[in-house]
Amino acid sequence: MQTRKTLSWIKEEITRSISVSLMIYIITGAYISNAYPIFAQQGYENPREATGRIVCANCHLANKPVGIEVPQAVLPDTVFEAVVRIPYDMQLKQVLANGKKGALNVGAVLILPEGFELAPPDRISPEMKEKIGNLSFQSYRPAKKNILVIGPVPGQKYSEITFPILSPDPAAKKDAHFLKYPIYVGGNRGRGQIYPDGSKSNNTVYNATAAGIVSKIIRKEKGGYEITITDAPEGRQVIDSIPPGPELLVSEGESIKLDQPLTSNPNVGGFGQGDAEIVLQDPLRVQGLLFFLASVILAQIFLVLKKKQFEKVQLSEMNF
């Protein structure tokens, strides 16, 4: 009897342990899979520094172009498109975290004026939904609905990203005004060269941390190298560890200098930023402008008719 109770207790403990382990795995896996797009969010309160530099450039060191297209003017409480273009050569392959080659991903941050925000799904037209595809946008911070981020997403499918934006209504939001506003955008393609903690990724060049002779190169079992540099006068040895991915440029017996590149630079991506302007237009001002234009056109018509009437009178007097 005692043996049965013991076995039953052991089964319960094993089942409980498996359940807890599974829950931890699911939670941890979800966190890891969702962590990559929010690297900047974890480290910076605001993605745009006082100098105008967008913080993504701190990890993506290469400079690449990015484009943005928005309407010149929008009316209050209107949904419009902000199209971000991240061009690159689709044939390029980047170094992945495991050292293998793979396709490039893209990502973007869109900094809108205060009051502008992501349009709710029920306000987005079917045509715009088709352009958006399966993209899922999120706010940079819960309290900063005007700053939107997206990525990483497959670059071959989403090198052009359409953001559905809702303009504010000054009649409902007292802090919104009918003005011209700036919009800032940052877009990257490919992996970064530096992680948020300051450490290097395997998608960058590795330099020698000491001058001397390359006395030994060991190829690691999981990829990458350990390079031993011996300082000839002192006999001091320094070991530089190279992760899998970059190609080695030096060989044993070679004399190298401090900060000399030990590897190639495998990075094929980069980050770019740009800006645009948009006017939140007052409908009354538009109506006033239309009324003014209509008045001018009518005045021109009346002048032409009056001129023709005057010419007829003159002609009749001459005939008389």
UniProtKB/Swiss-Prot annotation:
Species: Populus trichocarpa (Western balsam poplar)
GO CC entries: chloroplast thylakoid membrane
Family that this chain belongs to: Belongs to the cytochrome f family.
A GO term, aspect molecular function: heme binding
Membrane topology: Single-pass membrane protein
Protein name: Cytochrome f
Co-factor: note: Binds 1 heme group covalently.
Reported cofactor(s): heme
Chain segments annotated as transmembrane: 286-306
Compartments it resides in: Plastid, Chloroplast thylakoid membrane
